[in-house]
Structure formats: structure tokens, C-alpha cells
Amino acid sequence: IRIALRRITSRYRIPILITENGLGEYDEITPSNKIHDLYRIEFLSKHLLAVQEAITDGVQVLGYCTWSFTDLLSWLNGYQKRYGFIYIDQDESQMGSLRRYKKDSFYWYKKVIETNGNQLNY
């Protein structure tokens, strides 16, 4: 992503707003309603670090938005893959309570926001 941001800047010389960056995965909910999605944290952490490095290189980044705050219905995968920081109890056949459960990535990203990206570790 760092290289892509630098190339866009070099070619177009305009500020960049990253509007959608994230990871769809097969999240599993534990019997105690926990979702340990370290893979999402690692993915986003690496991408945010690359964005920070690009900014250091002179790229003007206006903002960064993740793919989705909550799990969503994908036109391709239904509810099989999960995308958000909050798990929604729902599946393709509309079976589920629609209850929401905060994933580990929710708490991590909350800390990222509170520190303005200065704390990416998990």
C-alpha cells in the first residue's frame, strides 16, 4: 500500500482518502461470545503502518476508513466471511438473533483511534 500511495501521489499530485481497506475472514464465535480475530488486527496494523510510512515519504493522506464497522451481507459470500469489528449473529438464511458482539479488533481499533494511530501494537 505504501508503494501504491507513492505512485498515486507521483502521478496525480493530489491528496488521497483511503475509503475502504479491510479483510473478510471466517470469524468464529466462542461459547462465551468472544471473537479472537488477530488476523484482522495484523492485517490492518500492517496497512496502517504502511500508510504512516507513506505519509513520512511525503504522501498527503486525508483519511483512512476500514471496510466496515459491523459485519455485512456480502453479495458474494453472504454472511460466511465477516468484515467488521462487530460480529452480527446472522446467516444467509436469516437465522440468527441479530445480537452484536465486539471482536478483539474492535478494542484494538478503538485504541488506534484514541492514540491517533500512535499505538498500532496488539
Provide a role label for each language-model segment:
Residues 1-122:
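Non-catalytic scaffold segments within catalytic domains of secreted glycoside hydrolases
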